[in-house]
């Protein structure tokens, strides 16, 4: 008869959780950032708010975003006028759109990851779905399971309302699932559609400027990864190993990044203090996770950072003395896609591996061995994942 310890050991993988494939997707509607202020103020009949519009133009110009992908087209907004009216009850209309579209966008990203993985979807044992877009029972994880045709026995975990740190949280959960369930293959899907947080300009030129910041930054996208330990090297291609993952709260900072769900949708509040608060607290997190590896030079690692906004990236770079190229992948994703909340950091991970493979830099982490995946969001919550790159043959 087997002992409890023998049973526990047999259930666990031997090696670390590994990223085996990545897929991303966006809505077809691409919006030029320079044209967005005119669109937002016209569609919400706010063109008469000239001073507020100039402030919003300045926000968009300073966002370092070239374009974004948004599900909300002019046609959809015209068919849902309450969404375009400041603080008008519109939650039902927003929810109806989000519930229908989030699983579909997630499916597209998941299919790309499964195709890259080149294995049968029947081998997926776990599903982690993360979104701030909608809430329903059964959830988006259930809908995606049906859309993909996954096994009815797939073990699902649904994560709602995580915000921008959700991608890191989903990876941390997937790491635990893969390493504690021998042979597990975990599909992680993060989907964000800004239908819930789209907001018309306020009636006052000075009120709720922090809400407008979100309108200048947030965008729609879905990302998916497949995670598993002990990859079968003949048929699976490892990209990154997840060596260590942790989450922490910055004390007394819950007001810095937050959002309120109301009858008028999800109202985001992003205070101007966020870049300073984040940059002042990141180094102690780095020391904590990299001390066992003897690493204290932050330019010696590769960076997969959530691109919350240019001011945040600039402050992190300044505080840690990072070389400009260290945050290249994050800045590229911000420029080409905007801030896609939980889905965003996995776009950066994808850009990291694509860029380094194209340049033939030796490893999936810009030729370096060790790296950091870093996410932050409401709480203020910080997710840190230590990555180990894989050699490029």
UniProtKB/Swiss-Prot annotation:
Protein's GO biological process: flavonoid biosynthetic process; polyketide biosynthetic process
Catalytic reaction annotation: (E)-4-coumaroyl-CoA + 3 malonyl-CoA + 3 H(+) = 2',4,4',6'-tetrahydroxychalcone + 3 CO2 + 4 CoA
Pathway: Secondary metabolite biosynthesis; flavonoid biosynthesis
Molecular function in Gene Ontology: naringenin-chalcone synthase activity
Transferase among keywords: yes
Keywords, in A-Z order: Acyltransferase, Flavonoid biosynthesis, Transferase
Keyword Kinase among UniProt keywords: no
Expressing tissues: Expressed in seedlings after illumination with UV light. No expression detectable in flowers. It is not known for sure whether CHSG encodes a chalcone synthase or a very closely related condensing enzyme.
Catalytic-site annotation from UniProt: 164
EC number(s) stated in the UniProt entry for this protein: 2.3.1.74
InterPro entries: Chalcone/stilbene_synt_C (IPR012328), Chalcone/stilbene_synt_N (IPR001099), Chalcone/stilbene_synthase_AS (IPR018088), Polyketide_synthase_type-III (IPR011141), Thiolase-like (IPR016039)
Domain of life: Eukaryota
PANTHER family: CHALCONE SYNTHASE, HYDROXYMETHYLGLUTARYL-COA SYNTHASE
Family recorded in the similarity comment: Belongs to the thiolase-like superfamily. Chalcone/stilbene synthases family.
Described purpose of this protein according to its UniProt entry: The primary product of this enzyme is 4,2',4',6'-tetrahydroxychalcone (also termed naringenin-chalcone or chalcone) which can under specific conditions spontaneously isomerize into naringenin.
Entry protein name: Chalcone synthase G
């Amino acid at each position: 008869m087997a002992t409890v310890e023998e049973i526990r050991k047999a259930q666990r993988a031997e090696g670390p959780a590994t990223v085996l494939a990545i897929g991303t997707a966006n809505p077809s509607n691409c919006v030029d950032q320079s044209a967005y202020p005119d669109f937002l103020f016209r569609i919400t009949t706010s063109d008469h708010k000239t001073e507020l519009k100039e402030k919003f133009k300045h926000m968009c110009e300073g966002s370092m975003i070239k374009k974004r992908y948004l599900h909300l087209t002019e046609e959809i907004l015209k068919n849902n006028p309450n969404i375009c009216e400041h603080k008008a009850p519109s939650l039902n209309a927003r929810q109806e759109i989000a519930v229908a579209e989030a699983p579909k966008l997630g499916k597209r990203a998941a299919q790309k990851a499964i195709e890259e993985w080149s294995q049968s979807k029947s081998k997926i044992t776990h599903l982690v779905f993360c979104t701030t877009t909608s809430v329903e029972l059964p959830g988006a994880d259930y809908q995606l399971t049906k859309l993909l045709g996954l096994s009815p026995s797939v073990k699902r975990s649904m994560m709602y309302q995580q915000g921008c740190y959700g991608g890191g949280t989903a990876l941390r959960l997937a790491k635990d699932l893969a390493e504690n369930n021998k042979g597990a293959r975990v599909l992680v899907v993060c989907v964000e559609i800004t239908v819930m947080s789209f907001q018309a300009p306020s009636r006052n030129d000075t009120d709720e400027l922090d809400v407008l910041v979100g309108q200048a930054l947030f965008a729609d996208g879905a990302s998916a990864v497949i995670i598993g330990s002990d990859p079968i090297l003949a048929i699976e291609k490892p990209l990154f190993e997840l060596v260590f993952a942790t989450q922490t709260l910055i004390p007394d900072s819950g007001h810095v990044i937050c959002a309120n769900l109301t009858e008028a949708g999800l109202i985001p509040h992003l205070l101007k203090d966020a870049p300073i608060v984040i940059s002042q607290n990141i180094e102690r997190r780095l020391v904590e996770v990299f001390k066992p590896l003897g690493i204290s030079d932050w330019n010696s690692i590769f960076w997969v950072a959530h691109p919350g906004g240019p001011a945040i990236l600039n402050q992190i770079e300044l505080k840690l003395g990072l070389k400009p190229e260290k945050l290249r992948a994050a800045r590229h994703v911000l420029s080409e896609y905007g801030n896609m909340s939980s889905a965003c950091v996995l776009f950066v991970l994808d850009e990291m591996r694509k860029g380094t493979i194209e340049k033939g830099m030796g490893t999936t982490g810009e030729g370096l061995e060790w790296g950091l995946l870093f996410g932050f969001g409401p709480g203020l919550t910080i997710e840190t994942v230590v990555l180990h790159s894989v050699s490029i043959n």
